[in-house]
Swiss-Prot record:
HSA domain ranges (all copies): 588-661
Segments of skewed composition (Basic residues): 1441-1454, 1504-1526
Modified residues (Phosphoserine): S358, S716, S1340
Sequence positions bearing Phosphothreonine: T383
UniProt name for this protein: Transcription regulatory protein SNF2
Gene Ontology annotations of biological process type: aggrephagy; cellular response to amino acid starvation; chromatin remodeling; DNA strand invasion; DNA-templated DNA replication; double-strand break repair; positive regulation of cell adhesion involved in single-species biofilm formation; positive regulation of invasive growth in response to glucose limitation
Keyword Metal-binding in annotation: no
Annotated region (Disordered), positions in chain: 57-176, 193-212, 305-426, 1338-1531
Chief location: nucleus
EC numbers, comma separated: 3.6.4.-
Keywords (A to Z) from UniProt: Activator, ATP-binding, Bromodomain, Helicase, Hydrolase, Isopeptide bond, Nucleotide-binding, Nucleus, Phosphoprotein, Repeat, Transcription, Transcription regulation, Ubl conjugation
Described function: Involved in transcriptional activation. Catalytic component of the SWI/SNF complex, an ATP-dependent chromatin-remodeling complex, which is required for the positive and negative regulation of gene expression of a large number of genes. It changes chromatin structure by altering DNA-histone contacts within a nucleosome, leading eventually to a change in nucleosome position, thus facilitating or repressing binding of gene-specific transcription factors.
UniProt domain Helicase ATP-binding: residue ranges: 779-944
Length: 1703
């Protein structure tokens, strides 16, 4: 194509260049072969040639006003190959808009949008000859010329002018660079180049300058020629060096070249040359030292700074513009000076606005030294000049070049610098300074730089509105139509904006470098500066990338023209397909329009919906804001309230601390500040109560004194005998009445007497210090006529302190008595021995025993031949007629907590009938339950002080009850502590309590360990059966059918039995051990026994003696068999042990060389008053519900006299009900520490609590089952090493125990023992059956039997497993039974009998049966399975005849076998026995041979069971409501002749034989000559022994046998022998083993059986099994009875002894 021969515009050149670059990138190496690329190359070369020629033409012409500043490139050029050259921007194109007037002060921005022609660059020749410097002009006309910045050409460095914008790349039209091999390098240079503001184009010369142009035109041309010659010379000089002045080193230049070449290779997908790889790898291996580079750069910048300041003046220039109404005048003579001043005027760095000054006379310049204008100078208006980015880069380049410039250039620059303009001053100041020849020109342009200014004269008066409008005075206010204001130069504004950005960047770079080089900056500051510096260095690259992206965007958005190759092909013709396609496109277009409309409609609906939603959300937001504000408001008030509460709590804590520290003064002061009305009320109440108590103390002292005085007057002794008793005058009481600040304690203990030593007649030993203090306290009470409570902890010697008091009164006070000491039966022998040991001088009578024994002692008491009487609680009531007649000086009650019930018979008897001057209570547990019980003790000893239980209880429990509120107000901690403190104040004078840890430092420690025992497989199965089904399941040996044992209403009690030993249930023992022989099964079936099998031999080997406490006597029976089996000697003490026998047992066990290792005791019987300190190990076999019972038991060994450390082992079955019992026991112990409880505290639990307990046990069992199924291991068994650590006291014992373990392990390995406990595989098959499936099958069978009627709904009854303290006390308030008492109580009337009917709550009301003298005292004790327990007497029974009765004792529970329900009863004809009830009733209750109850020791031995272990007797359960059921025991045993089947003659013969046998038994005497049959002649009296008929099913006696003989009722002599056997078996069931009746029955049966064999002539073994199963030697069933309160622990002993009853 031909190139048009015309001048190309800037836009055309830019468009051609972009297309040329696109083709080069698209075709790569093939670009030169593309025609379009060739054509564009020629066009660009032609345009470059045109611009070069134009520029040369302008330089040759030297026309003023058309010169342009040649701005060197500020960026250092990299060293290029030989053909490379620097780029210089061409001059601005003259083809600008013809009507555009450009001032010399205006900069023309060559941005991408304007596309100026100056963006094209032309290559310079090798010597840089084209780089011409502008000529200096000295003519006046230069005022309107563009300012030139001189560019030194030192060292021949090639500089170039660059446009301002970097968005488009500069053109490089050098032919050498159009080659492919140099193309990538040229692109890199273009992208990295910074585009600076371009040259400024001058406007046409003003008219004033043309007048003088001719004068200096020749001079100007001459100067331009000289400058060109100097430049060419300098270029030739630098050509020899060829080392451009650059900031890069040779290595850096080489690295840059390698990087650029590598980049080109990567872009073109070519391999990188090896030499470039080596250079790059070297730079990686040796990274540059950035600190050194920064230091070098800083030094470079510092050296550059002076040159920049010198060259700054060349950047500013001013053009004279003709202002309206102003004419510029120039003086020809001063043209040069003015021209120099204008051209070289420096630009102030702080002020961007300059005023053009027009000189007015010859003295236009005042002084060049101070830079001020002459007086005759004239101000010329001009436009402000803004320092742009191009100027800044120009300064940097000039500075770089000026470093090597000759000194002559610096001197020349300094000489041509004009004086700096000064800031404007007020006009009057300027006139004063230049008084002559000054001419002032008014300037209204605020942008002009002026010399002076005037302030407008503002009038302070009112301004008329008309003056603001146009009028003749103010012509300038007139608006002239058609005259437009001067427009805004947008190009200049853009240039200024870009210049400011460049300045800010440059300033930021300098600041970063300063921070990096400043060592004083912190590390973080320098690090941030380094980051900023790197970011700013990336700015050129970012601009280049942006330009590259924009060029492609422009190309993509441009329309294709014919210049593209796509249009070079031939245009094809239109056919039908095109029409169809067009039609289809049209339809698609219409469809799109329709869719667009639909879319717009949907969008409009969505917009409306969105608008509605937004409106709704705004309303919700407003609402939420209001709510949040309300919440914040509430939160604010809450915080304020919390802060106030914190302040109150802080004050309360301070008061509490003061109260705990006993700082009463500080507490009162803090309380006054708080003004707490509740505590103030409490204090007032406390003070009032203490005042009343103080007066009551005085009343009590007067009362005691009056009693003593009356006693003295009535007594026959002389008054001198009591002369030693301190007497208190009445005046002493009256004097203190007026003193309101009397100390409460000092009033009680007014008279003080120090005691230094014990009485001389106290000879048993030496009292300890704390015992001396106790004696002194008791003597102080005696001196002040007061009574008290000695409440020392168990084991601190209360007995000895009491004896010391009596001996002190006897010796020091000369008071010979009489003294009454009331003690429990179990401790009577201990008291007697202590008196004999410590006070033999005192004449002591132990008033107890049979009536005959007491009669002998009654005479001594009546005669007064005694000093001290020891008796029990029972004889206080029974022998009231005798003992109440004596006027006792001192009454001492041991175990005084039995006086808790103020309405008991004992308390009423003592208060009403007994006279005692002084009273003293001994107790180790004064506070067990609640405050009324404590009040009962205080009321007994101090009746005048504590006379109202109501006021006392209200005072401590509900102090705010009378403050007007109806709800119960709980006490806070502070109030509770305050109440406790005042309680201590009340009790301190009258109650003395010391703990062993406080006073007895030498007493060895007591260490308690809870030992967990695993269950055997049998225990686990039984436990789950009882827990889930409330019954146990055994196998019927006859039909191999599973049979369930019923009647276990008290489920928790049965669970405790299972945990202790499964053989408590005889049916289970028959399944596991049918022979009843003692073997390893006795300890393998129970985890506790297995543990004892390991522990007891170790204790025996190490010489430690053991006390084992039990709750159930049945377990004690099994324990006896176990101890005999492992060959350990033992002693046993339970409720059946008599008082005399107890003393003997204690003596045997405490003997120095005692052979007994173990002492097994019942917790209730053996836990009081026993001194067993020779034992140092205590084993609590099963935990009591009342923890104080266990504490009492522990202190049997841990007491004064103990030399060894006491180890307490509490056996607890793992995962059982025993863990719950232990937890509750610990909770009950908290009351001792707290003293006060919120509300009443008792030991009763409701049925809901019982059900909750069972539910918790079921849930726990279910959790354990899940764990077992999931494979989680249960708790491991206690290891032998752990047991040894518990038992061993030292290392030697540890070695012995370890050796024993090893020996036992070897023995078990030899025997092949795999598990010590019984495993499931060793159990009978019945225990492997699925009980649930069996029960479902039985239910289906029973439903079929009843034909769908279903069974009767069983009413659920819940039973408490707790017993109140009152019920527990019953066992303690009775002495031992009397065998020889003959007097009987009156029988109850029929009305009283009727009163025993069951009430609506399932409780039987009635009066307990008691015997005054002769008969036994029978009391219904609320406990289950108490077979061998003491009789407990309830004193409350004497108050009312309709009080709640306890449960009858002695019989086992009624147990039904499931298999016996459908069995047929025996025929009436086959039974020789008839009774009051119908035969069907009698026999329907007789189960099959396997029984569920227990047999006694006697029965077991008689039936040859193989082990002489007795079974405890229990009690039955009642229905709970309705009429009492018929009695199923106590039936008449009658043999009628009508039932006899033998002929009459045979019966007559049998009657003769039976009569001989009867007379033999009737007249038989033992070796002592005593007839044994007396007690068996008739049945016991129902009035005296009602429980006999409740226990024995068929009572029978010798009278019945005689009647049967007389009526010929016997078919054979064996039936007579069976009746004798029934008599003796009944006696052994009712009476205890070892009693007289028991032994007589054995002896009589033996001789009667022998006589029978002689008569019959047959010595074969007799079998009474079938007879025993039917007629009474089997466990019988009690009538259903429900008591008011159920025993808490349901233990098997009640600590009472039974009197042998005649049968």
């Amino acid at each position: 194509m031909n190139i048009p021969q015309r001048q190309f515009s800037n836009e055309e050149v830019n468009r051609c260049y972009l297309r040329w670059q696109h083709l080069r990138n698209e075709h790569g190496m093939n670009a030169p072969s593309v025609p379009e690329f060739i054509y564009l190359t020629k066009v660009l070369q032609f345009a470059a040639k045109q611009r070069q020629e134009l520029q040369m033409q302008r330089q040759q012409q030297g026309i003023s006003g058309s010169q342009q500043n040649i701005v060197p490139n500020s960026s250092d050029q990299a060293e290029l190959p030989n053909n490379a050259s620097s780029h210089i921007s061409a001059s601005a194109s003259p083809h600008l808009a013809p009507n555009m007037q450009l001032n010399g002060n205006e900069t023309f921005s060559t941005s991408a949008h304007q596309s100026p022609i100056m963006q094209t660059q032309m290559p310079l020749n090798s010597n840089g000859g084209n780089n011409m410097l502008p000529q200096r002009q000295s003519s006046v006309g230069s005022l309107n010329a563009t300012n030139f910045s001189p560019t030194p050409a030192n060292n021949g460095e090639n500089a170039a002018e660059k446009p301002d914008n970097s968005n488009h790349n500069n053109l490089n039209l050098n032919n050498s660079e159009l080659q492919p091999q140099n193309r990538s390098l040229q692109e890199h240079n273009i992208q990295d180049s910074n585009v600076m503001p371009g040259s400024q184009i001058n406007s046409p010369m003003p008219q004033q300058a043309q007048m003088q142009q001719a004068q200096f035109q020749a001079q100007q041309a001459q100067q331009a020629q000289q400058a060109q010659q100097a430049q060419q010379a300098q270029a030739r000089l630098q050509q020899g060096r060829r080392l451009p002045m650059t900031m890069f080193t040779a290595e850096q230049s080489e690295l840059l070249k390698a990087q650029i070449t590598s980049l080109k290779c990567l872009v073109n997908r070519k391999p990188i040359p090896f030499e470039f790889q080596a250079v790059i790898q070297k730079s990686i291996n040796h990274p540059p030292d950035f600190k050194r580079m920064l230091l070098s750069l800083s030094e470079f910048a510092r050296r550059r700074q002076p040159t920049d300041q010198n060259n700054q003046s060349n950047l500013n220039g001013g053009n004279n513009t003709q202002q309206p109404g102003t004419n510029s005048h120039y003086n020809n003579t001063n043209t040069d000076n003015v021209s120099g001043l204008t051209r070289n005027a420096p630009l102030d760095s702080k002020d961007e606005n300059f005023a053009s000054v027009s000189p007015a006379g010859p003295s236009s310049v005042h002084n060049a030294k101070n830079g001020t204008l002459d007086k005759n100078s004239q101000t010329v208006s001009g436009t402000p000049i803004t320092q742009t980015e191009s100027k800044k880069e120009e300064n940097e380049t000039i500075s770089n070049v000026a470093k090597t410039a000759p000194n002559s250039n610096k001197t020349h620059t300094e000489q041509n610098n004009p004086p700096k303009p000064q800031k404007p001053v007020p006009l009057n100041v300027l006139q004063d300074q230049y008084k002559e020849g000054i001419k002032v020109v008014d300037i209204d342009d605020p942008d002009m730089m002026v010399d002076s200014f005037t302030m407008p004269n503002i009038s302070h008066s009112n301004i008329d509105y008309q003056t603001l409008l146009a009028n003749s005075d103010h012509a300038k206010f007139t608006i002239e139509p058609g005259v437009l204001p001067v427009g805004i130069d947008t190009h200049t504004a853009t240039d200024i904006y870009q210049t400011l950005i460049a300045l800010n960047l440059d300033t930021t770079v300098n600041d970063c470098l300063d921070k990096l080089l400043n060592d004083e900056c912190t590390e973080s500051t320098r690090e941030n500066a380094l980051y900023d510096y790197y970011a700013l260095q990336l700015l050129p690259l970012q601009k280049a990338v942006r330009g590259h992206v924009l060029q492609f965007e422009w190309h993509q958005n441009s329309l294709l023209t014919n210049t593209h190759p796509n249009f070079l092909s031939k245009i094809r013709n239109i056919n039908v397909q095109d029409a169809l396609l067009t039609n289809q496109l049209y339809k698609n277009h219409e469809l799109l329009k329709l869719e667009r409309k639909k879319t717009e409609a949907v969008a409009r609906l969505k917009s409306m919906n969105k608008s509605a939603i937004n409106q709704y959300n705004r309303r919700q937001d407003k609402k939420n804001k209001r709510l949040k504000f309300g919440h914040r408001l509430i939160a604010t008030h809450t915080n304020l309230e919390r802060d106030e509460q914190k302040r109150a709590e802080k004050k309360a804590k301070e008061r509490l601390q003061a109260l705990k520290a006993n700082d009463e003064e500080a507490y009162i002061k803090l309380l006054d500040q708080t003004k707490d009305t509740r505590i103030t009320h409490l204090l007032r109440q406390t003070n009032a109560f203490l005042d009343s108590l103080t007066r009551a103390v005085k009343d009590q002292q007067k009362y005691t004194k009056e009693m003593i005085d009356s006693h003295i007057k009535e007594a026959s002794e002389e008054v001198d005998d009591l002369s030693m008793v301190p007497k208190m005058k009445d005046e002493e009481y009256d004097d203190d009445d007026d003193n309101s600040n009397v100390d409460y304690y000092n009033v009680a203990h007014r008279i003080k007497e120090d005691i230094k030593k014990q009485p001389s007649i106290l000879v048993g030993g030496t009292l300890k210090d704390y015992q001396i203090k106790g004696l002194q306290w008791m003597v102080s009470l005696f001196n002040n006529h007061l009574n008290g409570i000695l409440a020392d902890e168990m084991g601190l010697g209360k007995t000895i302190q009491t004896i010391s008091l009596l001996t002190y009164l006897y010796e020091m006070k000369n008071i010979r008595g009489p003294y009454l000491v009331i003690v429990p039966l179990s401790t009577l022998s201990n008291w007697s021995s202590e008196f004999a040991k410590w006070a033999p001088t005192l004449r002591t009578i132990s008033f107890k025993g049979s009536p005959n024994e007491r009669k002998a002692k009654q005479a001594k008491i009546r005669a007064g031949e005694f000093d001290v009487v020891l008796t029990t609680f029972e004889y206080i009531i029974k022998e009231r007629a005798l003992l109440s007649k004596v006027k006792w000086v001192h009454m001492i009650i041991d175990e005084g907590h039995r006086m808790k019930n103020a309405q008991s018979k004992l308390s009423l008897t003592l208060n009403t009938h007994y006279h005692a001057d002084y009273r003293l209570i001994l107790t180790g547990t004064p506070l067990q339950n609640n405050l009324p019980e404590l009040w009962a003790l205080l009321n007994f000893v101090l009746p005048k002080i504590f006379n109202s239980v109501k006021s006392f209880d209200e005072w401590f429990n509900t102090p705010f009850a009378n403050t007007g509120g109806q709800d119960k107000i709980e006490l806070s901690e502070e109030e509770t502590l305050l109440v406790i403190r005042r309680l201590h104040k009340v009790l301190r004078p009258f109650l003395l309590r010391r703990l062993k840890k406080d006073v007895e430092k030498e007493l060895p420690d007591k260490v308690e360990k809870v030992v967990k025992c695993k269950m055997s497989a049998l225990q686990q199965i039984m436990y789950q059966q009882m827990l889930k089904y409330r019954r146990l399941f055994i196998g019927d040996q006859n039909n191999k059918k599973m049979v369930g044992l019923r009647g276990f209403n008290n489920q928790i009690m049965q669970l405790k039995k299972i945990c202790n030993h499964p053989f408590v249930f005889e049916e289970v023992e028959d399944q596991i051990n049918p022979t009843r022989e003692t073997n390893d099964d006795i300890w393998r079936v129970a985890g506790k026994f297995e543990l004892l099998d390991r522990i007891l031999p170790k204790l025996k080997a190490t010489g430690h003696r053991v006390l084992i406490f039990f709750q159930m006597t049945q377990i004690m029976d099994i324990m006896e068999d176990f101890l005999r089996y492992i060959n350990i000697k033992y002693l046993r003490l339970d409720g059946h042990t008599k008082s005399d026998e107890r003393s003997e047992l204690l003596r045997l066990f405490n003997a120095p060389d005692s052979e007994y290792l173990c002492f097994i005791l019942s917790t209730r019987a053996g836990g009081l008053g026993l001194n067993l300190q020779t034992a140092d190990t205590v084993i609590i076999f099963d935990t009591d519900w009342n923890p104080h019972q266990d504490l009492q038991a522990q202190d049997r060994a841990h007491r004064i006299g103990q030399k060894n450390e006491v180890r307490i082992l509490r056996l607890i079955t793992t995962n059982s009900v025993e863990e719950v019992i232990l937890e509750r026991a610990y909770k009950k112990l908290d009351i001792d520490g707290k003293v006060i409880q919120a509300g009443k505290f008792d030991n009763k639990s409701t049925s809901e609590e019982q059900e909750a307990l069972l539910r918790s046990l079921l849930d726990a069992e279910e959790e354990r089952r899940k764990k077992r199924e999931s494979g989680v291991e249960e708790e491991e068994e206690l290891k032998d090493s752990e047991i040894n650590e518990i038992l061993a006291r030292n290392d030697e014992e540890m070695a012995v125990l370890t050796r024993m373990d090893e020996d036992r392990s070897k023995k078990e390995e030899e025997l092949g023992v795999k598990s010590r406990l019984l495993e499931k595989s060793e159990l009978p098959d019945i225990y492997s059956r699925d009980i649930g499936a069996e029960l479902k099958r039985e239910e289906s069978e029973s439903a079929a039997v009843y034909n769908g009627r279903g069974a009767r709904e069983r009413k659920t009854a819940t039973y408490n497993d707790n017993m109140s303290e009152e019920q527990w006390l019953r066992q303690f308030e009775v002495s031992d039974d009397e065998k020889n008492d003959k007097q009987a109580r009156k029988q109850r009337t029929k009305k009283e009998d009727k009163s025993e009917a069951i009430d609506g709550n399932g409780e039987i009301k009635g009066e307990n049966i008691d015997a005054d003298n002769d008969g036994p005292r029978i009391n219904n004790i609320s406990a289950e399975d108490r077979a061998d327990t003491d009789l407990a007497m309830n004193d409350d029974d004497f108050l009312s005849k309709k009080r709640k009765a306890g449960r009858p004792r002695g019989r086992p529970k009624k147990v039904k076998l499931e298999g016996s329900e459908n069995s047929e009863p025996p025929a009436l004809e086959s039974s020789p026995v008839t009774g009051d009830n119908s035969p069907s009733e009698d026999f329907m209750d007789i189960p099959k041979p396997r029984t569920a109850g227990k047999t006694s020791v006697k029965s077991a031995r008689t039936s040859t069971r193989g082990r002489g272990r007795g079974r405890g007797r229990g009690r039955g359960r009642g229905r709970g409501r309705g009429r009492p059921p018929k009695a199923r025991n106590g039936l008449d045993y009658v043999r009628t002749p009508a039932a006899a089947t033998s002929p009459i003659d045979i019966r007559e013969k049998v009657a003769k034989q039976a009569l001989d046998l009867y007379h033999f038994a009737l007249n038989y005497e033992n070796e002592a000559g005593r007839k044994l049959s007396d007690i068996f002649l008739s049945k016991p009296s129902k009035a005296l022994y009602p429980d006999y008929y409740m226990i024995i099913k068929y009572p029978v006696a010798f009278d019945n046998i005689n009647t049967h003989i007389e009526t010929l009722a016997y078919n054979s002599l064996k039936e007579t022998l069976q009746d004798f056997h029934l008599i003796f078996s009944n006696a052994r069931i009712y009476n205890t083993e070892g009693s007289v009746v028991y032994e007589d029955s054995l002896e009589l049966e033996k001789v009667v059986t022998k006589k029978y064999c002689e008569i019959m002539g047959d010595n074969s073994q007799l079998d009474f099994t079938e007879f025993d199963e039917q007629y009474g030697t089997r466990p019988l069933v009690l009538p259903p009875v429900v008591t008011s309160s159920v025993a808490e622990s349901f233990t098997d002993e009640a600590d009472s002894s039974m009197t042998e009853a005649s049968v």
